[in-house]
Each structure stands twice: as C-alpha cells, then as structure tokens.
C-alpha cells in the first residue's frame, strides 16, 4: 500500500513549540484523511528546529465507494414531488429509480445512489492547504511579499518549502501538487543550513531520512536527545566529572540543533563562591549549557557543557571560547547580585515603620529587604492587597497552626516575616525560580536559626505530586499557612479554578495542604483554620463578607479523592467515609485505609452483602413513605434470629463506638465483622414483610439498627459490589 510523506520546512521553530506542533500536524492530517474515507496502517511525526515531518504508512490509494439508499414519494404522488425527489437524488428520470412496496404505505420510489470513492492524492491535495493555513500555532507571523495580501499565510516562522510525496514501496513516488501562498509542494528539501544547504530530491520516508542524515540532520528528536545526553555524560566522565542532569534543558537543547555536537568550556574557579543554584541558572537560562560537578559532590565544578549545531573545523575551539566569554560575563553579573544582596540598603530610615510592624532588625540585610517589600506596597493581587499585608495574614494563620502542631511560635513568626523577603533581592529579581532558595542562603549568612532558614525555603513546598514535603514542624506550619491564605483569599474573591483553567495554581496549593497533613500525619481540622484565614483577610478587607468555608471544604474533598485514588484507593470507599462536614483529612484517610482492608477480606464482603440488602429494603420502604423507628421492641421478637441479631448489634455498636473514640478504625471494623453471621441467619430465617404490621415495623427497625451500626464507620450503601 502507498505511503505518504509530508515535510513543512521553515526558519527556526521555537524549541518549546516543536513537539506539540508535530503532534498537531499528525492529528490534523490523519483526522482529515479518515473523515474523507481513507484508512492507514500507522503514522509517526518528527521534528527538528527547521521542519515538521509526517510519515504515514499503508494509506489507501482510494477511498471506498459509498452506497446510499434514499427513500422518495409514493408512486402516485404529484409531479412536483417526484421532480423534487429526482433533483435531490441526482437522477435524470424516474425510470432510474426503484419501486418498493409496503403493505401499509403502498408503493414508493427509492433511489440507489453510489458516491464513487476518490483518489487519496486528490484528498491530500484538498485538505493540506487548509491544515497549513489554520495551523494552531500559539504565536504566528506573516512574511514575504505575499504577507501584504489579505488572508495571507501565518506561520510560526517564515515557511520555506513543502514536501509531499505519495506512492507504494514497489513503485516510483509521485508529488501531490498543491500550493499555499506561492509555496508549491514538491519532492525537494534541504539539509543542514551550513553543512548541506543544497537541494535534496527525496522519494519516500526511508530515502528522506537517510539523505537528511547524510546532509547533517538527525531527524528523530528522541535520537538527538540520546546523542546529546550520552555525549555530555561521556565528556564529563572523561574529565573526571559528572553531568548535572536537567531533563527540561535537554529537551530544549534538542530543539535547538539538527546536528548536535557536544563541547566543554570552563570559567574561573573564583566564581564558584556564588551559590550553585545561581551558577546553574545563569548558565542554563542565558547560554542553554549544562553544569558539572565532582562525582557525588553537591557543589559544582568550573566546567560547563554546551551543545553546538555545527561541526567546526577547529574542533569547536572558537565556539567554546565565545560561549566562555558570555558565561563569564553573566557570572560576573551574578556575583554582583550576590554581593549586593548581602549589603545594606541606602534608605534604612524610611523602612523603620515597616520594621516595627513586623519586628524586623534593620541591621540585617534580609530584614531590610522585607521592610522594603512592605514599604513599597508591592501588590500581591489587586483584590487581596500587598505582599506585606499577605505576610501579616500568613503570620496570624501560622501562629494559630503552631498552637495545634506544637511548633515553636517564636521560630514560626520569625520564619513568616522573612519568608517573602528574598522577593526584593537582586538574585531573585533575575531568577524568580530561586525564591525561597536564596532566602534560605541569606538567612544562614545573617545567622538565623536553622529551622527559620529551612522554613523560608520550604514554605513553597510541596509544589507538585513528586516534590518533597517539609517534615520540620516550623516549616510545615509556615507552608500550611502560606497555602491556606492563598486558597481562602482566592475563594473569597471568587477566583476559583474552572474546568482546565487554574491560573493561580489553587489545585496545586490544595494538594500541598493535603500532602502536608497526610504525609506529616498531622491532626488538623480545616474548618477552624479557614475561619482564621478569613478573619485575617477581613481585618484588611472588610468588604469580603461571603461564607466560603463549605465550598472550599468541598474543593478539598475533591482533591483528596484524586490524591487517594492515585494511591490506589477506590472512589466508592472514599465516598463511603466522606461526609460533607468532614474536615479532618488524616481521619478520612485512615478510615479509607481501614475500610479497604476490611472490605477486601471475606468477613467484610459478606457483611457488605447483608448490609446492602438491609439498606435496599429500608430505602424501598422509605420511598413509599414508611417511617422506620430508631428503636425496637424486644417484646415483638418471634424468632431467635431476631433476638440474636439485636444483641449482636448492641455489642458490635458499643465496641465499634469505643474503637472509633480511640481512632482505632481497624478495631471498629473488626467489631462490626461480628455482625456477619447473625445478619446472614436473620435473612435466612426471618421474613421481614410479616403480615402483622407491628412485627413488620419492628423488623424494619432492626434493619435500621444494622444501617446505623455500620454507618458509624462508613455508608455501606455507597460501596459497590
């Protein structure tokens, strides 16, 4: 079967857009072909900085004929109706129609229409111009002489050529002719911009990829990535060093080169006095280079690794020299930031009111930066006030949390008032991703307690499902307070996540709170701390009066379900223990854990079956309007099974309630498991729907006691199975 090769070659595509663009090309083309009636065996996309390529294998040469039967009017219909039918069906005369008979409706005309299939080449030529014109680039531009015309092509960078060939492996391929803005599809591409700029004639994918490789273009991005990673590790190893792995940088650099060549440069060792994080980001952000270190060491070496797109005649000496000059200049700037951040600010007198407000020591550089942050009224959010106001709110929440968690209040308060100070440092101004990290370093330099320095860095954590969770009590209190203020604040101004949109990362903040509580094994009822957060906010913004606690708690429940589900818990078991007012996340998780263990054991499965039978009977009766009593009358018992079940329920309920009081949910489940046998015997021996209405009502009340007893630990009616 024929194969289809498409290449869209342009000026350099931004690295961050390449992978998605190639995927978009594959989806748009294959969807259009399938919609037109074609099928294919497989498709794979490729990309380099200058081209998007699509290889479609086993594409039908022609779409199948479509047969359609169109029903017309009765044979005795008027002439106007018949003429309309002929026009709609595309028939020249009524003699071309068939007559069908229906016992009820009589004879009527039917047109058998055959829509012939189309050649795949015609379909491709038809769909490709629209796909190219409407391509979903995040940003695009017009270029060339055609750009002055209305409706001219927009592409991420100027589009230079289009390859589109079609044909079976056993025959010569054909160019599918179409044009977009004066660019006509052909079988001509070009290799590396510098090493092989000559035109290359290609036939099908294997030939295309092979010729590009000879023209210094590695088409497969994953292979380029492997080459860069392996060569970088090897050159580091050869110099007695190890590469500091950076998957994000590796992905970006892969999108910057078509013919990767890995080289090593160096800078003066004196720059190693700068924190490693600053060195790494300086070299990564500005020069797209990797850093190295001694094997097993934390600190960096003065060697960096760069990736070139050309094979230089001098072995890369000039490239290394040029990159080294830029790296040294950038590191010189970074050293300047680092030293300035440790010095005094020039306007300390004006910072005294802010210093008094937060108990800051203006003799210390980090305290000065916090005072400056407050004095400048730097906005956190237009509706939520300044960063200084936010720090004041976080302080209130963190001190309340410290009372519950047992964290040292003085250390918590000191951590909070310095937590955002590094936002006014030059290092964080240059590299915002270092916030918290630089605060930690400056705190250590000015002699802060280790718990304070750690809390400054850790209060942003965890920032995702795989990020480390702070375990120190001070760090945990500040991290929780920071996130609770964020969530309560944005809920109060009705800036909640909607659908896939979450501009303030509130889902991540809620997950952070959940992980801090569960992984820290912290007993922390959320509702009281929502109140603390809202009270702190309303002290500053009295106009924010809405009650958001119930809605915010429901949001936490949703995120908790996702978190527990990712850990393997069943949704139905989570729902079974979750009530709308439950705000102790650790207790919810423990209940789910205990219920999971119980319900997967034989005793639990059997009790579940009996309990569900009881709740179903009760639900049916209550739907009819029957009121089920919450007490039973032992005088109405007629069978031993009733008496035994009643006694067992009382004993199991007492034991379960006592275990729950001790927060021993496994023992509570074990107590309930003793109901299994008496419940089974009851349903085997007792007819609930007795003719005597009093006995029937009493037996329904007995079923109600089963529901109440099991309801102490979970709503068994929500458990599937």
From Swiss-Prot:
It holds the Pfam family tRNA_synt_2f. Coiled coil: none annotated. Disulfide bonds: none annotated. GO terms for cellular component: cytosol. It catalyses: tRNA(Gly) + glycine + ATP = glycyl-tRNA(Gly) + AMP + diphosphate. Its EC number is 6.1.1.14. The keyword Hydrolase does not apply. It is an enzyme of class 6 (ligase). Keywords: Aminoacyl-tRNA synthetase, ATP-binding, Cytoplasm, Ligase, Nucleotide-binding, Protein biosynthesis. One of its GO terms (biological process) is glycyl-tRNA aminoacylation. Belongs to the class-II aminoacyl-tRNA synthetase family. Tetramer of two alpha and two beta subunits. This is Glycine--tRNA ligase beta subunit. The gene is glyS.
